[in-house]
Amino acid sequence: MEERKVKRIIMFPLPFTGHFNPMIELAGIFHNRGFSVTILHTSFNFPDPSRHPQFTFRTITHKNEGEEDPLSQSETSSGKDLVVLISLLKQYYTEPSLAEEVGEGGTVCCLVSDALWGRNTEIVAKEIGVCTMVMRTSGAATFCAYTAFPLLIDKGYLPIQGSRLDELVTELPPLKVKDLPVIKTKEPEGLNRILNDMVEGAKLSSGVVWNTFEDLERHSLMDCRSKLQVPLFPIGPFHKHRTDLPPKPKNKDKDDDEILTDWLNKQAPQSVVYVSFGSLAAIEENEFFEIAWGLRNSELPFLWVVRPGMVRGTEWLESLPCGFLENIGHQGKIVKWVNQLETLAHPAVGAFWTHCGWNSTIESICEGVPMICTPCFSDQHVNARYIVDVWRVGMMLERCKMERTEIEKVVTSVMMENGAGLTEMCLELKEKANVCLSEDGSSSKYLDKLVSHVLSFDSSAFAS
């Protein structure tokens, strides 16, 4: 009897942490279902393949091979113009010679690409003769907003005008004008091109995989189905599926991990405010100063992640008030990095002050932790509005109100006065996330459909 060939999936993430991590989680889900997975990655921000020995990693060099790489590690630091950066990525990295890069080794079912690569991935797919699926790293509600951008421009909502910030967008309830998922950029037309290309790429694909679940975004998913007219697979939360992925990395300094764990273990249940603004968001020095004093004045225990370079114009903590670290004593910990999944799951954590990136939002929902919402750009504004007004599992703390007394007020309110009500809603949503992953849950059923869908494609090996 002829031995059955292993089906292979090619995955093409955008090289940012918030996009790469969910793609790797999806790769683990596919691998757990018996697929071989090859990860294509740009030559910068290249991940450590040794952390994922079950996958094959291939470097895609930019199309002007022999020239200096047009992008460098420094170009992806906080505060860079993301529209310019994504435009460069799309320009230089979406027409690789995949036959040479990936080689042979199994039958290729499909190419799964980050939706932001847009229609150019169709060129990639044609080169290898397979179908293309896209993965969205933000929620369905945000994608609905992106599909409406041409209408929003016609209606005068975009570009955003300061005088209309609190006006409701009647076409996209419950969003206000200030919630529209835009990015501050010197090339607004470039942003429109990227988003239009993303939407059109999704329409041309053989399906869209979403890191969300039906009970969380039922109405938004219905809207997306109507607009895209392709199969949708909301199989999230990705990170809760059983896979053979290794645990998330620890701090390089094992002693730091042990000190932090020991400190958390000494705190009362649900007493700690965990603060983290993700891998790309940047804040101003005066905001950093106010956050520090707001946390201190709350008199609540806090764990605050401050990435090197997160505060514009500084390396790390030099902007802290003189004597601040000594002043907080054992009240708080300021660190460069933590394992977020482990932190949110710790019983001492009672609230998450977040930038509302989609990964952070989903992870907090899964652990039943109330959120303090300070969105910075793009989909974070949409996520924050849904967290506060639709799912009712958080409170808003806008950047325009980033003043120590307001910070103290909101943090205290979430942890003490309104905490009970928020926690109850959080636990209900957490239970829905657990149910969707059960054997008869919606995400489990969609995963079965996704696997069948991928296997139904006309398989073809790489052209020789």
UniProtKB/Swiss-Prot annotation:
Keyword field contains Zinc: no
Top-level taxon in the UniProt lineage: Eukaryota
SUPFAM superfamilies tied to this protein: UDP-Glycosyltransferase/glycogen phosphorylase (SSF53756)
Binding site for UDP-alpha-D-glucose: 279, 338-340, 355-363, 377-380
Pfam families linked to this entry: UDPGT
One GO MF term attached to the UniProt entry: UDP-glycosyltransferase activity
Top enzyme category: transferase
This protein's UniProt keywords: Glycosyltransferase, Transferase
E.C. code: 2.4.1.-
Entry annotated with the keyword Glycosyltransferase: yes
Family of this protein: Belongs to the UDP-glycosyltransferase family.
The protein, known as: UDP-glycosyltransferase 76F2
